[in-house]
Amino acid sequence: MQAQIVNKIFEIFSKNNPSPKTELIYKNDFTLLVAVMLSAQATDISVNLATKSLFETYDTTEKILELGEDGLKKYIKSIGLFNSKAKNIIALCKILISNYQSSVPNDFKELIKLPGVGRKTANVVLNCLFGMPTMAVDTHVFRVAKRIGLARGNSPEIVEKELLQIINEKWLTHAHHWLILHGRYICKARKPDCDICPIKEYCEYYNSPIISK
């Protein structure tokens, strides 16, 4: 896709939503990290429902450790993979306390050393908490980027690299939020709402001859 078309797409995203934010609800740096970890293979809605009562009382590494793994499971049992997520969160709390004075590190390499933290989680944290121009590739970003024509890769990591190369730096701070929200509400997995899509004239999928309009 030509750079001028990519710029036009993100100009439209920016005009329609100048300051996009994560839809995960959190109280501080630590609770955002926990929420993002819980969001793996789960919806933001389901995570917010589970963490509402959890974060009201347990919003620090020390408090989560006091709650314990079994106690944590009771709060997050409605979320997929809650057993392994609870185990990772408890292990993560211990490391944050011992190695980082309970603070969330602002370094990618340090973040991905933590239990349960992969590339996507690390990139979300760096972007949302520290304003870094990262590209967190979840299922929405992966699908939308390939459907629009922004990327061709067959893995999230390759798509991440492609997007970082093709998207102008001035858009990168908000780019992954725009792509997520576009995928969540318009460019849906099974049936994209092309009729209301603000970027359809630039979309390879929409302009494909095999697509009925």
Swiss-Prot record:
Residue ranges of every copy of the HhH domain listed in the record: 108-127
Cofactor: [4Fe-4S] cluster
Reaction catalysed by this enzyme: 2'-deoxyribonucleotide-(2'-deoxyribose 5'-phosphate)-2'-deoxyribonucleotide-DNA = a 3'-end 2'-deoxyribonucleotide-(2,3-dehydro-2,3-deoxyribose 5'-phosphate)-DNA + a 5'-end 5'-phospho-2'-deoxyribonucleoside-DNA + H(+)
Cofactor binding, note field: Binds 1 [4Fe-4S] cluster.
Pfam (any one): HHH
Keywords: 4Fe-4S, DNA damage, DNA repair, DNA-binding, Glycosidase, Hydrolase, Iron, Iron-sulfur, Lyase, Metal-binding
EC number: 4.2.99.18
GO molecular function annotation: 4 iron, 4 sulfur cluster binding; class I DNA-(apurinic or apyrimidinic site) endonuclease activity; DNA binding; DNA N-glycosylase activity; metal ion binding
UniProt record, GO biological process: base-excision repair, AP site formation
Binding locations of [4Fe-4S] cluster: C187, C194, C197, C203
Name of the top EC class for this enzyme: lyase
Primary role: DNA repair enzyme that has both DNA N-glycosylase activity and AP-lyase activity. The DNA N-glycosylase activity releases various damaged pyrimidines from DNA by cleaving the N-glycosidic bond, leaving an AP (apurinic/apyrimidinic) site. The AP-lyase activity cleaves the phosphodiester bond 3' to the AP site by a beta-elimination, leaving a 3'-terminal unsaturated sugar and a product with a terminal 5'-phosphate.
Family listed: Belongs to the Nth/MutY family.
Protein name: Endonuclease III
Lineage: Bacteria, Pseudomonadati, Pseudomonadota, Alphaproteobacteria, Rickettsiales
